Every structure is written in C-alpha cells, then in structure tokens.
Amino acid sequence: MRIIVLSSSPNTDGLTAACVRAAIDGARREGAQASEIRINDSDIGMCKACDNGWGTCRDEHRCKVEDGFQKAHQAIVESDALVLVTPVYWGEMSESAKALTDRLRRCEATAGEKSRLQGKPVIAVAAAGGTGNGLVSCLASMERLIQHVGAKRFDMISVNRWNREYKLSTIGQSAAAMVRGMR
C-alpha cells in the first residue's frame, strides 16, 4: 500500500514538517509505504488557464504546462491514499499547495466519476504556526478540493502551536487508521 504525503511548506523543521513526519510514521507503523513529496522543491507553477481555462485538462485530464506537476500528479494517481499537509497562510493553503491543487482539480474534477482520485482516502492537515488563526477556512478549501476530485475525506485535522503535541499524535493515529481501513 502506497501513501503519498504532500508537504507544502518551505521549512523542513517547523510545525508542518512535524505533521508530515507524524503522518509518515503512522502509515509506516501499519506496514504502508509512505513517502513525502515536497511541493516547494518540485518546481510546480500556477495554473495558466490555457485555452480560455480549458486546455488539455478538460478532455485529456492532463496539464500541458510542463514542469514538476506531471511527476507529482502521476505519483498521486498511483498512490492508494493521500495526506495533504499545508501551513495556513492568511486562512488558506500555502501558495505552493494551491498551485498543485488548482491544477490537480482541473485535471481530475473534469473527469467526473472517472477521476483517478475517485474514492481515494485523503487526510487534510492545516498547520497554523503563528497566530493559530485561519484553520477552519483553510480546511474548508481543502474539503472542497477533496469533493471536487471525487476523493474520500478520511480526516480533517487542524494543528497550531498550542495543541501541537497531541495533534501530532492524532495525525499519526489517523494515518495508521486510514491504512488499516484500506486492508
């Protein structure tokens, strides 16, 4: 079983990184292969809205803008489940997460029931390291993504610097439970 953890923070040692490690550890405890894709290191640009907003994404379910998106998209499609971890910036996912997820949404949501993410379990983690504000609105936008691509919302977890310790444990437990549920 292959779990992809999408990380969208420029930091490798902050709250978001700790959430990623907790998810990977939890999935691996249950015997899954879990690996991280660091979106910030993947050279993924924003959607160009080709051809009046509907380029190859609508009919071929692939993005014609060549960059790191193709590799990430393929890994996501080939995975059995996803964990999306983002820092909260201004009540939203990070810019790098939005770049990936906007393009992913266009490629997969347009496929309807043939979306390659249809029924795929997803854990969404929003990590607010500063004020702790914006968690609910960030998770709401992550939930819309999950709905649009036809994936299955397994868990939605908010984390801030005050609840960090027990929420890291929660993330690991959630990833482990997701793996167990797919057996």
What kind of feature is each model-predicted range?
Residues 95-96, 109-155:
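Short, glycine-/small-residue-rich phosphate/pyrophosphate-handling segment
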Residues 1-113, 153-183:
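N-terminal beta1-alpha1-beta2 submodule of the flavodoxin-like/Rossmannoid cofactor-binding fold
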